[in-house]
Amino acid sequence: MKALYPGSFDPLTLGHLDLIERGASLVDELVVAVLQNPGKSPAFSLEQRLRQITASTEHLGNVSVISFDGLTVACAKEQGTRLILRGLRAMSDFEYELQIAHTNRSLAPEFETVFLTTSAHYSFLSSSVVKEVARFGGAVDHMVPRVVAEDLARFFNSAFAPPSR
């Protein structure tokens, strides 16, 4: 069985990685699909996010990383799967994700969404929280893979570096 795990992953967190690892243990193949959303202004380019996820999942032989734009169900169809994997941290996530799952089923009734709850020690994590902590110089190495922590340090150091003379 093959599943699709879509998201913007800006940036990838250890919570995302935990879901990828756990999801990969449940299916024959897991496709991590990185959304290119023109309505958002990500901290990291699509290429950077693809590189971060690929580097962070290289130990998983059944995980591939792709990019997509448009509808998740269209991407899943292109990948030859009807199974979409999503993570839940709290009830507020469930309400949002349930709405998206119902929308996906209205577009393609053959699709199923499987929800995995996050591991308790990652339940506080979100990409937004990570960026906020990094923006103010806080340590994020316990929140993100090493490659992401390094990229965040470069991003925020360059964003706040004084102009050269």
UniProtKB/Swiss-Prot annotation:
Binding site for substrate: 8, 40, 72, 86
Annotated metabolic or biological route of this protein: Cofactor biosynthesis; coenzyme A biosynthesis; CoA from (R)-pantothenate: step 4/5
Recorded coiled-coil stretches: none
Subcellular location(s) per record: Cytoplasm
Reported cofactor(s): Mg(2+)
Residues annotated as site: Transition state stabilizer: 16
Listed transmembrane segments: none
Main location: cytoplasm
Enzyme class: transferase
List of residues binding ATP: 8-9, 16, 87-89, 97, 122-128
Ribosomal protein recorded as keyword: no
Reaction equations catalysed: (R)-4'-phosphopantetheine + ATP + H(+) = 3'-dephospho-CoA + diphosphate
EC annotation from Swiss-Prot or TrEMBL: 2.7.7.3
GO biological process, one term: coenzyme A biosynthetic process
Binding partners and assembly: Homohexamer.
Family recorded in the similarity comment: Belongs to the bacterial CoaD family.
NCBIfam families: coaD_prev_kdtB, cyt_tran_rel
PANTHER family: PHOSPHOPANTETHEINE ADENYLYLTRANSFERASE
Protein name: Phosphopantetheine adenylyltransferase
Organism name: Synechococcus sp. (strain WH7803)
Gene (name only): coaD
